[in-house]
Amino acid sequence: ADTICDLEVTEPIHATPIDPPTMSITISVNSSPLAGTEGKKLTSTQIKDRLITEAQNNVGITFSQNANVDSFVISGRGELMLEILLTQMRREGFEMTVSPPKVLYQQDENGNKLEPIEEITVDLDEEFSSKIIDSMNRRKGKLLDLKDTGKDKKRLIFHAPTRGLMGYTSRFLTLTKGTGVINRIFHGFGKFEGEMDGRKNGALIS
């Protein structure tokens, strides 16, 4: 990036680091007998050209083509980013099959498994605090802060693995009866927190 400044200023402004991808999906050409009923752009070439354009304009998206030339692995920063891309493509007339999302893991210098961790900020009515804390604990979330923000209002801050948050927004809205507000940002990669309880309901991103 370029820094525009006074001639006497010689130190450039450092670029803001880009968060790494934390989740991936695989999209494939729809080969079912019903192909073409919901869209007109069906071929792997059309899908690839669209993904190339997306990767050029969206620094948060990367993709690779599988050995099976009819499928592509798309990586992005969370389920919302991937959901937006899929929605845009379908509105543009693309038809494809989509795999369930997968979390992207890393390893540290000692070979230990690391997973993406998010910071979650929740604003809600006090009466729902215990339900949200319990639901986050089930997802390996750790409560960092709890404070009053007004009459009968609370703000909770958690760190939780990305894999535990897939599909959580709808669950959160149910638990808070639609009154809570949840914000998520990437925090970093941390120690793998172990297996979680089985999911009661499935999670779809598109």
Per-segment meaning from a language model:
Residues 1-206:
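Accessory interaction regions appended to the cores of large information-processing enzymes
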